[in-house]
Every structure is written in structure tokens, then in C-alpha cells.
From Swiss-Prot:
<dbReference type="GO" id="GO:0009535">
    <property type="term" value="C:chloroplast thylakoid membrane"/>
</dbReference>
<keyword id="KW-0150">Chloroplast</keyword>
<keyword id="KW-0472">Membrane</keyword>
<keyword id="KW-0521">NADP</keyword>
<comment type="function">
    <text>NDH shuttles electrons from NAD(P)H:plastoquinone, via FMN and iron-sulfur (Fe-S) centers, to quinones in the photosynthetic chain and possibly in a chloroplast respiratory chain. The immediate electron acceptor for the enzyme in this species is believed to be plastoquinone. Couples the redox reaction to proton translocation, and thus conserves the redox energy in a proton gradient.</text>
</comment>
<feature type="transmembrane region" description="Helical">
    <location>
        <begin position="152"/>
        <end position="172"/>
    </location>
</feature>
<dbReference type="InterPro" id="IPR001457">
    <property type="entry name" value="NADH_UbQ/plastoQ_OxRdtase_su6"/>
</dbReference>
<dbReference type="InterPro" id="IPR042106">
    <property type="entry name" value="Nuo/plastoQ_OxRdtase_6_NuoJ"/>
</dbReference>
<feature type="transmembrane region" description="Helical">
    <location>
        <begin position="10"/>
        <end position="30"/>
    </location>
</feature>
<protein>
    <recommendedName>
        <fullName>NAD(P)H-quinone oxidoreductase subunit 6, chloroplastic</fullName>
        <ecNumber>7.1.1.-</ecNumber>
    </recommendedName>
</protein>
<keyword id="KW-1133">Transmembrane helix</keyword>
<dbReference type="GO" id="GO:0008137">
    <property type="term" value="F:NADH dehydrogenase (ubiquinone) activity"/>
</dbReference>
<keyword id="KW-0520">NAD</keyword>
<keyword id="KW-0618">Plastoquinone</keyword>
<dbReference type="Pfam" id="PF00499">
    <property type="entry name" value="Oxidored_q3"/>
</dbReference>
<comment type="similarity">
    <text>Belongs to the complex I subunit 6 family.</text>
</comment>
<keyword id="KW-0874">Quinone</keyword>
Length: 176
């Protein structure tokens, strides 16, 4: 999508602030329903990030799969659980919460100070062969596969890591 510079920048700032507010809502809200709705906001903002980079199919797939299926499943699971068990033993801060908060804050501060100082122009994420340029001989499914394995490799891997962490968290919660 070819947007003028100020509109593109405003869109990125708007979606980024939606991501930050939704992420804070997921972590800080004590009601699990509100937290699940905040997760839905985060997933919608992530899917909308793909639209300015002209990957409408990935945005639609992200929206359908994560918001339409996963988040609705999480909301149904939270609604079927007993809500009183969340509030019985509610302590404001424990030692583990403090250590986790300190660790996450230090990682966040180190990333905020490191990322702007890094020269990203020398980093080559992927290499494309000359065969990919000839797109007339390639079907749409193959083009999606090529784009997922070259142009969108990093977001695809980050999504797979997020799914792995969610799966491990679900297994840990089910064992308790």
C-alpha cells in the first residue's frame, strides 16, 4: 500500500500504541474476560500491521485464525471456568511477581536502548534467487510460500514462537 509518509507514520504509531495498550491490558487487568478482550485488540493490531506492507492475505489469515478462532476459544474457556477462583487468593505482589517484573523491565529497557543504536542497513534477513523474480510461472499458493519463507520469514517465526509459548502455558495451566 503506497501511503504518503505522514499517514504511514500515523498508522504505525496508532497501531503500535494499540499493541502497547492491549499488551498492558492483558498483563495488568485482573478480570480474565477483560484480559482476553485486550488480547483480541493486540491480535487485531498485529494483523493490521501487515496491510501497509502489501500482504493482505497474511493480514486476513491472521485476523481469521487468531482473532476469529483462538481468541474466541480463549473467551469461551474463561467463561466456562469458575470465576471465583481468581479472586480468592489474590495478593498484590509476591516475590516471584517482583522478580519477573524486574526481569521484564530490564529486558525492555535494554531493547529500547539497543534497537535505535543498531545499524540495520547491513543486516540481510533473506536472500532471493533470480528464479523468484519470474512470477508468471508460479501459482498463488507458491507465491505465498515463497513470501512466507523469504520476505515474511521473521514475522512467521515470531508467530510460531508465540504459539509455542501459548501451548506450553496452556499445558502448565492444565496440569495444575
Amino acid at each position: 500500500m503506497d501511503l504518503p509518509g505522514p499517514i504511514h507514520d500515523f498508522l504505525l504509531v496508532f497501531l503500535g500504541s494499540g499493541l502497547i495498550l492491549g499488551g498492558l491490558g492483558v498483563v495488568l487487568l485482573t478480570n480474565p474476560i477483560y484480559s482476553a478482550f485486550s488480547l483480541g485488540l493486540v491480535l487485531v493490531c498485529i494483523s493490521l500491521f501487515y496491510i501497509p506492507s502489501n500482504s493482505h492475505f497474511v493480514a486476513a489469515a491472521q485476523l481469521l485464525i487468531y482473532v476469529g478462532a483462538i481468541n474466541v476459544l480463549i473467551i469461551f474457556a474463561v467463561m466456562f471456568m469458575n470465576g471465583s477462583e481468581y479472586y480468592n487468593d489474590f495478593h498484590l505482589w509476591t516475590v516471584g511477581d517482583g522478580v519477573t517484573s524486574l526481569l521484564c523491565t530490564s529486558i525492555f529497557v535494554s531493547l529500547i536502548t539497543t534497537i535505535p543504536d543498531t545499524s540495520w542497513y547491513g543486516v540481510i534477513w533473506t536472500t532471493r534467487s533470480n528464479q523468484i523474480i519470474e512470477q508468471d510461472l508460479i501459482s498463488n499458493g507458491q507465491q505465498i510460500g515463497i513470501h512466507l519463507s523469504t520476505d515474511f520469514f521473521l514475522p512467521f517465526e515470531l508467530i510460531s514462537i508465540i504459539l509455542l509459548v501459548a501451548l506450553i502455558g496452556a499445558i502448565a495451566m492444565a496440569r495444575q
